[in-house]
Every structure is written in structure tokens, then in C-alpha cells.
């Protein structure tokens, strides 16, 4: 073998090892750039937690100060919210569908509320 070829090969191998070592991540240095972000997020979460506590206390005080008229409105308001949530939910209460004929699907066991008709209708679409 040619000695120059051996030297060139060993030099390339040595450079490859040095470059690989320089590119390796050091665990102590890797987390340094994220420390300010972690501190900032911890401070933000603590501040939000304190704001949430203040808001919860204010809501409790408002409930304590509410008069008898407010107590009567609460169930009606909850019922209104529940009906709105039901309307916004996808129609997934059926346990199956069947194809009657081409392009006509009927639901089996579906009782869907049709707000236009004002009553529940059997699941034929």
C-alpha cells in the first residue's frame, strides 16, 4: 500500500472522529436555552392560578349575596343551557342505520328532536 494513501485515510478518519465529538450534544448545555422559557411558563401558570382563585372567590361571594329571585332563575338557566348543548351535539344516539333503497337511509331506534316540528320524530331521514 502507498504510505500517502494510508496517511490520508487515517487523517480523514481522525477528522471524522473529531467532528463527530464536536457535534455531540452535551446534556448540561442542551437545557440551558430552555430554562428562561420554563421559568416564564411557571410564572405565568402561577399567575393564572392566583387569578383563578380570585375569580372563584368572587363567584362564591356573588352566589352568597344572591337573592331569592336568583335562586328561582338558576334551574331555568341550567335547563336552557342543557337544551342548547343537546342541539349542538352531533346526532349520535342511534344504534344503527339501514339502507332501505338506493339513496334512502333510515335510522333504527332513533328518536331525534326536530326543532322545526316541535316534537320528536322517528328516525327516517
UniProtKB/Swiss-Prot annotation:
It holds the Pfam family ANP. It is found in: Secreted. GO terms for biological process: blood vessel diameter maintenance; cGMP biosynthetic process; cGMP-mediated signaling; negative regulation of systemic arterial blood pressure; neuropeptide signaling pathway; receptor guanylyl cyclase signaling pathway. Keywords: Cleavage on pair of basic residues, Disulfide bond, Hypotensive agent, Secreted, Signal, Toxin, Vasoactive. Expressed by the venom gland. Coiled coil: none annotated. Exhibits natriuretic and vasodepressor activity. Acts by stimulating cGMP. Belongs to the natriuretic peptide family. This is Natriuretic peptide GNP1. It comes from Varanus varius.
